């Protein structure tokens, strides 16, 4: 699969999947054994999506156009979430995503800031 197509598919599925809390659709984008580091300077967290989606009442997000070089894409995104404890969270970030030849994610490193 072409990296540009894979990256756009990744962004589209994440945007819909985050809004709908569809962890299955999102995890289907990743190759078995893929590295996904959700926060810099922290170890990857198994079960991250399930934990985060359980803490969110609703979310709205937007993913930008991927910037692609070889098998790597950088994708900017923003999200506004309403948490189950009544709080809100506004995030702005970029995901650096490396794709395998089959178009599945083999490595992802996320960087974000809470506004």
Which residues does each predicted region cover?
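A general structural signal for well-ordered secondary-structure junctions
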Residues: 24, 36, 58-59
